């Protein structure tokens, strides 16, 4: 492509609205333009990058035996009501009525639609297994869209759905997709980790997220320094370290703590550590107030709590709501004779003679012991992981790092097929529900994540597999017939070698051409300028590390073709 004929509207200044590097650089490099909050138009250069990801995804999905199809973005509400998700999904699901007063929604996922298709078309175990996928625009009405394509309302997604006869076969389908995802993100040139994850609104028994490692990632992930264990914060397990504690149970004692409400203030006043104190935090769970006990230096992981209670959502109650539910001001609440349900983190159950709120203003209790003094309805791992906690798998040290979720795979089981009465006949003639899995990749988010992981102060540094153009040829002598002829010849030879090439034939200063080449992140720059007349050489520069070589035009095309092919097959 000739730059003079291309629509790549670059910007010198960083737009004020852009907070993270990928958003800033995508706007500056002419990838996209904002239409409304969280909604963008993809310009040719940005769309080319998205198409590169799509092609890799498509090749690997087909290689894994999945078949591509396309489903409508608008979905009838009745399908979602069959599974109960129409009410559960929340305001992120955009709902509307058509002129005939039929209720519909814009699909953020397509479990209901694909299950409806399969229940009407497949009826025998002989039809299975099957895996169907699409690459399509989705819409999710995010409350606070931000970071460009990282958290937009409209996005490009690949979603696949597998149907199997039993759990054993469904596990094989899941494993096949898991391996396909590893190949996809490896081919995209990304540093990533698969992590154990909570299934969230999609549902199911088991899932993994694929996280691109980046400092600007919105998600915190937990990884072991000594083994392959990795999980997101919501799913990360805490290994309870067994400790011998022969301490005798001391007598319960009420102590005055005037005006001391916060953990640190109480600890300073009583000259104890937070590890000797248990916090009582009150959450609303489907309209019920539930007290949660965690050690004084810990925080509650809300997803773990939600899963324990079996509710759709939990929310920490404010001071007034806590007082209305318990009659105790926040900061002095404790689990002894509390009038609401109590659940406890497993760590609390092995503590002895600890401190809690006294359920009376300005008082705490000393020498509390769970089994003697409290009524606890359930115990589970409810706390957030901390750096250097022991790994639940090998006992090594855990560390926290940031990541960007680009893919998610789920074992759905029979939840959707049973609620929608989607069944097949097995080999004995019995009717059974399909065992399902679903598998998503945020295609447009992959591009943003790649930029977050690959950029510098001058612009994007595209991995070769995702670059809209792998080579840019800079003609620095438009008025010099020899330079122009050499640039044109190289442009033609590189294209003939199967490379995607941008010929910068604009009437611009050399400095402007260099800056745009760096901003756009094109992996290789081939400069044809004064060096050609001086010593018969052109300059080849690698964007990633700035490595530069001079060579003859005859050598340059073959050299670049070999370099790029090597990076595509690494």
Curated annotation (Swiss-Prot):
It catalyses: tRNA(Pro) + L-proline + ATP = L-prolyl-tRNA(Pro) + AMP + diphosphate. GO terms for cellular component: cytosol. GO terms for molecular function: aminoacyl-tRNA deacylase activity; ATP binding; proline-tRNA ligase activity. Its EC number is 6.1.1.15. PROSITE patterns: AA_TRNA_LIGASE_II. It is found in: Cytoplasm. The keyword Metal-binding does not apply. GO terms for biological process: prolyl-tRNA aminoacylation. The keyword Magnesium does not apply. Pfam families: HGTP_anticodon (PF03129), tRNA-synt_2b (PF00587), tRNA_edit (PF04073). Its main location: cytoplasm. Keywords: Aminoacyl-tRNA synthetase, ATP-binding, Cytoplasm, Ligase, Nucleotide-binding, Protein biosynthesis. Belongs to the class-II aminoacyl-tRNA synthetase family. ProS type 1 subfamily. Catalyzes the attachment of proline to tRNA(Pro) in a two-step reaction: proline is first activated by ATP to form Pro-AMP and then transferred to the acceptor end of tRNA(Pro). As ProRS can inadvertently accommodate and process non-cognate amino acids such as alanine and cysteine, to avoid such errors it has two additional distinct editing activities against alanine. One activity is designated as 'pretransfer' editing and involves the tRNA(Pro)-independent hydrolysis of activated Ala-AMP. Consists of three domains: the N-terminal catalytic domain, the editing domain and the C-terminal anticodon-binding domain. Homodimer. This is Proline--tRNA ligase. It comes from Desulfotalea psychrophila (strain LSv54 / DSM 12343). The lineage of its organism: Bacteria, Pseudomonadati, Thermodesulfobacteriota, Desulfobulbia, Desulfobulbales. The gene is proS.
